[in-house]
């Protein structure tokens, strides 16, 4: 019998921002930031979101897990300091939890505004707020090339088929609004995923990520009042040719009813190459 979120304690009902295809079935212009951050191609759906603390979620089965990590850092405004001091912390925490042989943290986002700041004329994001569109950061197509640029050809040759991309997400202060929600990987079938590709002006591929359509049976979870010592670790991609469904986790921020006047969420997320 399939697991039911509704049967658990601490369930909330919230609207999630899913992707809506064009009426003719064609894909939208993925370079248009309103497709990712604005109101274009938006399908707002009411869903049940369970309490992640209610179960022992596992990376290998569910695609995500909740782990303890008390950081020595409290100020994340200096990007170079984050790279120098926080990256090693996160890498060690991931290695300890997963048994990975090598972890390379390669970028991060600090989110401390209520909404992303869009400059639609320049087609850029001026500041980063909670990402409310349901998505998966990485989709097949251009991933190996991007990783090669960051980690080098020697890494790709040595660890081919053995690495994953994971996100490590934690609050900078206790979350009171716009929490992160993640979906049990197996509850989101491949047919609900749309590979959206962004291209540079010269026509080369810039980014490939999954948008997510609403579907029956998606199982969503979040951490109520998530504390600074609680880190959500979730998988976005696997280089293993026999990759499983738990290797891509849909996620998004969502509006928690009744919290709109609470302090703005502050969080830090690190993306890492994890070698097994």
UniProtKB/Swiss-Prot annotation:
The alphabetical list of record keywords is: Oxidoreductase
Q: How is it used?
A: Phomoidrides A and B (also known as CP-225,917 and CP-263,114) are potent inhibitors of Ras farnesyltransferase and squalene synthase. CP-225,917 and CP-263,114 inhibit Ras farnesyl transferase from rat brain with IC(50) values of 6 uM and 20 uoM, respectively. CP-225,917 inhibits squalene synthase with an IC(50) value of 43 uM and CP-263,114 with an IC(50) of 160 uM.
The reaction(s) annotated as catalysed by this protein in its Swiss-Prot or TrEMBL entry are:
2-[(1R,8S,14R,15R)-11-hydroxy-14,15-bis[(6E)-oct-6-en-1-yl]-3,5,9-trioxo-4,10-dioxatetracyclo[9.4.0.0(2,6).0(8,12)]pentadeca-2(6),12-dien-8-yl]acetate + 3 2-oxoglutarate + 3 O2 = phomoidride A + 3 succinate + 3 CO2 + H2O
- Annotated signal peptide: none
Q: Name one GO molecular function term.
A: oxidoreductase activity
Q: Does the keyword Oxidoreductase apply?
A: yes
Reported EC number(s) for this entry are: 1.-.-.-
Superkingdom in the source lineage: Eukaryota
> Top-level EC class, please?
oxidoreductase
Q: In which pathway does it act?
A: Secondary metabolite biosynthesis
Instruction: Report the family membership.
Output: Belongs to the asaB hydroxylase/desaturase family.
The record describes the protein's role as: Alpha-ketoglutarate-dependent dioxygenase; part of the gene cluster that mediates the biosynthesis of the antihypercholesterolemic agents phomoidrides which are dimeric anhydrides. Within the pathway, phiK is responsible for the iterative oxidation necessary to convert prephomoidride to phomoidride A. The pathway begins with the highly reducing polyketide synthase phiA that catalyzes the formation of a C12-fatty acyl-ACP, starting from one acetate and 5 malonate units. The hydrolase phiM is involved in the release of the C12-fatty acyl chain from phiA.
What is the official name of this protein in its record?
A: Alpha-ketoglutarate-dependent dioxygenase phiK
Species per Swiss-Prot/TrEMBL record: Fungal sp. (strain ATCC 74256)
